[in-house]
Amino acid sequence: MAKYDDHKQLKCSFCGKTQDQVRRLVAGPGVYICDECIELCQEIINEEFEEDMDMAMRDLPKPKEIKAFLDQYVIGQDRAKKALAVAVYNHYKRINSKVKSDDVELQKSNILLLGPTGSGKTLLAQTLAKLLNVPFAIADATTLTEAGYVGEDVENILLRLIQAADYDIERAEKGIIYIDEIDKIARKSENPSITRDVSGEGVQQALLKILEGTIANVPPQGGRKHPHQEFIQIDTTNILFICGGAFEGIDKIIESRIGKKSLGFGAEVQSKKEKDVGEILKHIMPEDLLKFGMIPEFIGRVPIVVTLDPLTKDDLVRILTEPKNALVKQYEKLFEMDGVKLEFEKKALDLIAEMALERGTGARGLRAILEDIMLDVMYEIPSDETIEKCIITEETVRKIAPPTLVYADAQKIGRKKAKKTESVS
């Protein structure tokens, strides 16, 4: 509080009121501000903050908009996309809401994606981050170990997110982290062991704090922590964690639980051979995850469990051709740059999908199959300006015949050369 001066009456530099007219006058270097002006400034700041929050809420895509965006990149999995859209919308609504300490506390809801290899778990998480324009990082749970053992500390996951945000901590604190192969850190046996399980239960324990929300100390260069280094501090309260895993064998655990019980109006659950694995997974309960080897505390921190269906042949054909980043569209664009039209026969696409199913790699295996098929023709075409069209047939996929090539006449070749010259100049 400024001291009273008999010779000169002190005034607020903003409103002009004297010290006698206000409760308090705060002195600065050559200026004064009264308590009334401080309150007014606080009100202005609060109003602007509320406007920013309202704008953030208006900009947040609604669940239907989120699903529509996911539909552009991910084929099938409608139920999973709906569940993810609602969960992500609620998560960012919670961050952007003006929740006061005396109101209802909205807890964070991390997500567990459960589905076969190549069913779209990673792609779903990546696409969500792309839509929301937030930093995104992928971590592999199999590389993590408990602190003090050879391997990566869980804090290194956070470092990847910070790096994705260009070291903007505030942005990173609203990012998304996808932890893949989370099923591989299941406890080695259902009963707690007296020996250390440093890559299983130990990692689950280490992840608990950052999943729930804590101020984590992250080594800026990665690697192990040591007491004499500086740390980057990051609050994980608003980071959305999406954990994904195939959880192979969990369908048997679910079946053993519900197999003899009736569902609906006394209908018995069919055997695994008759029942689709995807349908069985829809009946998953926390107790099944517990039996699989996930610890109760971990299960409690990923309350939203989303199951993905195994991909069918038709799904894989659609994945090849329909999404914005479909592999066939990408190859067509690459060929177009060389002035060649690329076509895939329907039987060729069906066979590629069948090969991916046989390998058990799902959508992930499609690119490897296509690269193998396309290598020779992509090597030859740029050097031959007479080629106008390339058709990939079933025989091409089976490697019993090369692609069908259509050659242009001399007039077209001349126009093609002229077009190339124009683009270079």
UniProtKB/Swiss-Prot annotation:
Ranges of residues in domain ClpX-type ZB:
1-53
Gene3D superfamilies to which the protein is assigned, alphabetical? 1.10.8.60, ClpX chaperone, C4-type zinc finger domain (6.20.220.10), P-loop containing nucleotide triphosphate hydrolases (3.40.50.300)
Record GO cellular component, one term = HslUV protease complex
User: What positions does the entry give for Zn(2+) binding?
Assistant: C12, C15, C34, C37
Q: Which UniProt keywords apply?
A: ATP-binding, Chaperone, Metal-binding, Nucleotide-binding, Zinc
Q: Which domain of life is it from?
A: Bacteria
Pfam families per UniProt: AAA_2, ClpB_D2-small, zf-C4_ClpX
* An annotated Gene Ontology molecular function: protein dimerization activity
> Where is ATP bound in this sequence?
P116, T117, G118, S119, G120, K121, T122, L123
InterPro entries per record: AAA+_ATPase, ATP-dep_Clp_protease_ClpX, ATPase_AAA_core, Clp_ATPase_C, Clp_protease_ATP-bd_su_ClpX, ClpX_bact, P-loop_NTPase, Znf_CppX_C4
One GO term (biological process): proteolysis involved in protein catabolic process
Record's subunit section: Component of the ClpX-ClpP complex. Forms a hexameric ring that, in the presence of ATP, binds to fourteen ClpP subunits assembled into a disk-like structure with a central cavity, resembling the structure of eukaryotic proteasomes.
Q: What does this protein do?
A: ATP-dependent specificity component of the Clp protease. It directs the protease to specific substrates. Can perform chaperone functions in the absence of ClpP.
| NCBIfam families for this protein | clpX (TIGR00382), PRK05342.1 (NF003745)
- Which family does this protein fall into? Belongs to the ClpX chaperone family.
Q: What is this protein called?
A: ATP-dependent Clp protease ATP-binding subunit ClpX
The organism is Caldanaerobacter subterraneus subsp. tengcongensis (strain DSM 15242 / JCM 11007 / NBRC 100824 / MB4)
Q: Gene name? A: clpX
